[in-house]
Amino acid sequence: MAKSMVRSRFGSLLAAVFLLHGAPLAAADRVLTVTSTATITTMDPYAESESQLYFIWCQVYGCLGRLDYEKKAFVGMLAEKWDVINDGQTWRFTLRTDLKRSDGGPGPTARDVVHSWNRIMTDPDSQQRFLFASVKDIVAVDDRTVDINTKTPSSQLPADIFGQFAITSAELFEKHGKAGYKTHPFGWGPYKYEDFAVDQRYVIRKNEAWPEKRPEAPDVVVYRQMREAEQRVTALLNNEVQVARLVPPQLVARLQGRPDVKIVPTGSVEIMFVAFSPASKPWDDARVRRAAAHAINRDAIIQRLLLGYADPLDGPLGPHQFCYTDGSKAAAKFDPKKARELLAEAGFAKGGPEVEFYSSTGRYISDRQISEAIAQMLQQVGFKVTLRTPEWANLWSSVRNGRVPAYYMGRGQVADPAVALSQYFETGVSPRIKYSNPEVDGLFQKARATFEPEKRCEILRQVADKLAEDAPAQFLWSHRLINGVRSNVDWPNDPSGEAWWLDVKMR
């Protein structure tokens, strides 16, 4: 009785909200509302490159496969199997035959895969071309078989595209055009579109056509944007949301000792860093970059602002990632004396340089306090810092387009580090840092051509060492994610910070 009353209360509350927007919910629905600090800006599955939206689109439209973080292995989704042929330059995917589109249409075909790739590569709004930097073309062999041909042998193709490359219907695009993502957002994933409002919510509902049945999983998932941490915690305690993500350490005490909520902490594969773009002065001088890296007292920030809820990084690889064995010996340690010496060598013995440092506020755990602390640390060794904290959407757009010289940010879903490191540090892949180093480029290419896992990891560790030495970014920590969860919800202990909703249980 009590459990059904709780579910009814969820349903009644959200039904009132959604009736206002033309999307009523049934009282018997298992409705799970989860907070979001990330971008909720578009329904177009190719117009954004953000971790949370990738998770949504993969579960609505379907991806060829995804990374199972618990198994640390790639598993199929729309594809039932894949093989490497043609001396490592072709990945052949075989699609499942037991799927139907959420509007009752046919299952996914090779033509849909080719269409989706063409959308990414030719649509002017696409933000995902970097996913296919290694791809020459994609060819339909038959209805169920598709070949992805790479420019050179590429061992990391699944890491490049699994969980991110959403497959959309060629048939619906031909009938309804590009705007069909608003009017006919139908796919083959375990959930389907229900409702959307920019910077407010994204709502998905179970797809009854999905073959695998999980009756305890939520029928409806509501992503509700809440950037203020106090608001997230209050909403959880009031049962307005059932999962409050990114609870800052200083608010954990509000959740302790409550029988109706629980704290679910987990390690993270999101790497937090400060970027220094070598395309902008004074960051074109490696001595200035390393001076800034030595100025940051990472351990003090972890203890005082994060209250120990973070794992320090020496370089870009951490304990929850593939290929990690130990930190990079070349990583800059806190050493303000060394920072001042490097600035003097670079011509700033009498003060300066003047820099603008950018950060979000409310996107990451305690990001305002952390960015203020970093700015003060830079000033203490001689930098003249102006701290800029624009709205997250504006900052993210500027970073993606290479317009921010120095910033504090995170990169999520870095289980296999090759993709994220290539995205930020390989020449021509994206302009986010505008770092270019032929030696590092060669290592990335060598890693892609290496199919033996340990040999590939050894090459990626060389990349990590070179980045730590050259300091286009100072890698700081991976957060220990703190989730506040209602006691009737079983939340997976997943280092991605996101959820595969069929794995969530509501009682």
Predicted regions and their residues:
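N-terminal lobe/hinge region of extracytoplasmic solute-binding protein
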Residues: 35-86, 115-118, 184-188
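Gly/Pro-rich hinge or "lid" segments in bacterial periplasmic/extracellular proteins
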Residues: 68-70, 162-216, 220, 230, ...
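Ligand-site clamp/hinge motif
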Residues: 179, 208-254, 376, 384-386
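A structural "hinge/loop" feature
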Residues: 38-54, 77-79, 105-106, 128-129, ...
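Detector for C-terminal structural segments
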Residues: 29-32, 197, 206, 272, ...
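Aromatic- and charge-enriched surface segment that lines or borders ligand/interaction sites
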Residues: 80-126, 147, 235, 282-284
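Structural transition elements
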Residues: 283, 312-346, 363-369
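Surface-exposed binding/hinge segments that line
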Residues: 9, 94, 128-172, 195
